[in-house]
A protein has these predicted regions:
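Residue-level recognition of single "structural anchor" positions
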Residues: 1-189
Length: 189
């Protein structure tokens, strides 16, 4: 499910748009105030994705500019970094519905760098945690402190030893579906 707009909620519940809009924002505020901020533990998947990418390239090659240069990049470009905790083996054994991610911590940054990833991991992941990532050099800073395992997405989605960061990739799949299909525009706030 990609989310419900205020207009759709107003039709479903039978209230006007303003009432549905206020209800959605009150729900969002309540979720934010009562979220679980304890450290993630055991097995965690981490990854980053960029939103507000470069605009569409010009048709003619001579009119195109190099968007890799900082002065040509979109000023609103941001990196969303997610850390998702798996259910433990014991939790899965007790309840067969405990599959996928147990909790998620999401951070908005300017870029996916070693300093940013290091500070995020320090704030939200226990030191004994096992972190699964892709082979981005930004996550190399985690090697001395955490049990870091990587998968090379250029060659495979799941390594032969079972390492995958599919929970983080799943989050971004749903996030982008919400971004393009429901919200259409996101402010950086």
């Amino acid at each position: 499910m990609k989310g419900v707009s205020a207009l759709q909620l107003s039709r479903d519940v039978g209230v006007n748009y303003r009432t549905a809009f206020v209800l959605i924002h009150k729900l969002r505020k309540a979720l934010l105030e009562h979220r679980d901020n304890t450290l993630l533990s055991e097995e965690i998947d981490m990854d980053g994705a960029y939103v507000h990418p470069a605009p569409r390239k010009a048709n003619k090659k001579v009119d195109r500019i190099d968007y890799r240069l900082k002065e040509n990049q979109h000023p609103d470009k941001r990196c969303i970094i997610v850390a998702r905790e798996h259910f433990s083996a014991g939790e899965k054994a007790v309840n067969r519905f405990h599959r996928g991610a147990k909790r998620s911590q999401v951070f908005v940054t300017y870029s996916e760098t070693q300093s940013v990833v290091g500070s995020i991991a320090e704030r939200c992941i226990q030191k004994a945690g096992r972190i699964n990532t892709d082979e981005s050099v930004a996550y190399d800073v985690l090697l001395p402190t955490y049990d870091l395992r990587t998968v090379n997405h250029k060659e495979e989605y799941r390594s032969d030893s079972g390492v995958t960061n599919n929970q983080a990739e799943s989050f971004f799949s749903r996030f982008k579906r919400m971004y393009y299909g429901q919200l259409h525009k996101i402010n950086n706030q």
